[in-house]
C-alpha cells in the first residue's frame, strides 16, 4: 500500500465530486496534484500541493482554495488534523489507528511489501557492462555494472520481465591488438626476450598465463605456421580466456547476465545481419552515398575525404549523418551497433535500456536516431551514463595495478573490501555524478559508512528477537501474537518509524519511474538512521526499549515494528544484491 498515492487518489476523488470547478465551470485538470512527505516531519505526515496547482484554473487564492479542500477532507476517519501552511500547501496528520493498521498490513505482506504491480510482464532489455574482452574488468566498469544490475532487479521486483544482456565487442581492431599482445607473451613463454612491451599493445601481466598456456599446448608451432592462421587461433583463445576472466570478475560482484551477445554474430554469413539492416534502412530512405565535412577540431577514423555510404541520421534527431560503409567497403563500428539494435528490436522488447560510461555521452544521439529509424519511432529507448569512479585510501589517490598494466581492477577492489560494500557504495551517488570511493571509509564501522550502518540496523533487529526469546521465554514468536497487540504502538517515536517504513513503496515507485536505483540506497540508509536514533533513545529512556519484561503485550507490539523494519531492510538489500546481516562480527 502506497499511503501517498492512496491519499492522492482520495483527494482527487473528493475534488471530482465537489463543486470546486474551473473559472468557466469546467472540470479541473488534477494530474499535477501530488502527495508527499513534508520536508519538515513536525509539520505533519502528508503534504499536498493540490491548492497550489489548481489555484490559477479556479481563479482562487491558493490559501482560500486550500481551505475549501480542507473542508472536503477533514471528516475522513483517518485524518487527525489538517491545516494550511505557507503559500497554500496542505499538511495532514493521520490518526494512530491508521498507522497501526498500516503496520499490520506490512506484516501480513512480509517481504512483498512495496512490490507494486507496475510491470505487468512487459519485457525490458537492460544492456550493461559490455566491456571489451581485452583484459580484466577495471573499477571504471564497476559502477555501470552495479547500476545496471540493481536497476534490473528493481524492475523485476515490480513485475517487469527483464533480460540482462552483455554485448561482447569481439570483432574490432582491439581484438587484433589483443592477439598480437598475447603472441608477444607466447614468445616470452618460449624463452624469447621481449624487453619493453611495444606501444599500442596491452602491457598487463594478466596475459602472461595465456602465453604460457599456448606455449605448453603448441610449443613453437604458432611461430612456424601461416601468420594469419596463428593469429586466428590466438584470437579465439584470447577472447575465450578474457570473457572467462570477465565472467569471474562479475560473479565476484554477484552479477550474472542472461545473454552474452557476440559482435561476431553480426559479421557471420558475410555480415548478413549488417547487410539486412542497411537494406532495411535503404527501403525507408535513410541511406545515401555522399561525403561528410571534416569534423571540427578532431580526427575520427570514420571520416574520409571521399564518397561513403551514409545513414541520414539527422532526419531522426542526430547532430550529423553517420558513416555505415567506408570507401573501401568495410563496415564501421556504428554499422554493427545499428544491426545489434535491430536484433534487439526484432526480439520484441517493450523497452531497451543502455547503461554506458560517461565517455559515451557523444553516442547518445546516434543511438536514439538509429532506434527511431529502425523501429519507425516505435521503440522505447533509455540511455543512462555513469560518471567516473575515483579511488582513494585515507583521502589519497590509489596507485594503478601492475597486474592490469594501467588501471585498478574490479577484482582488486572486491577482494579487499568485499562485494557488498562495493555494490552499495556504487549506488550511493546519482550515476551522473562523479563518485569517490575510499577504501578506508567503506571498511570503517561508523555511521559514515552507509553499508555498515544499514547492515548494523539489520543485525540489531535480529538481536532484539534473540533477546525476546530469552527474556519472554518464547521459542517462536508468531505473527498472530504480534498483530494482536499492534494497538499498543502509540509513542510518537514508534509512529515516526512506521511513517518511515510507509515511504518504501513510494521510493520503489519513484526509483522505477525515474530509473534511479540510487534512491533505494539513500532510503535504506535513512531508514537505518531513524532506527538507530530510536535505539539510542532507549539508552536514556528505558520505557522506549523494544523489550519490556514487565509488559509482554507491548513487547510483542514492538517486535512487530522490528519485524517490519527487518522485512524492508531485507527486501531493499536483496534488490541491491546484498544479503541482510543477522549479526555483526
From Swiss-Prot:
It catalyses: tRNA(Arg) + L-arginine + ATP = L-arginyl-tRNA(Arg) + AMP + diphosphate. Its EC number is 6.1.1.19. It is an enzyme of class 6 (ligase). GO terms for biological process: arginyl-tRNA aminoacylation. A motif ('HIGH' region) lies at residues 131-141. CDD domains: ArgRS_core. Keywords: Aminoacyl-tRNA synthetase, ATP-binding, Cytoplasm, Ligase, Nucleotide-binding, Protein biosynthesis. Its main location: cytoplasm. PROSITE patterns: AA_TRNA_LIGASE_I (PS00178). The keyword Acyltransferase does not apply. Coiled coil: none annotated. It is found in: Cytoplasm. Signal peptide: none annotated. One of its GO terms (cellular component) is cytoplasm. One of its GO terms (molecular function) is arginine-tRNA ligase activity. Belongs to the class-I aminoacyl-tRNA synthetase family. PANTHER family: ARGININE--TRNA LIGASE, CYTOPLASMIC, ARGINYL-TRNA SYNTHETASE. HAMAP family: Arg_tRNA_synth. Monomer. This is Arginine--tRNA ligase. It comes from Bartonella henselae (strain ATCC 49882 / DSM 28221 / CCUG 30454 / Houston 1) (Rochalimaea henselae).
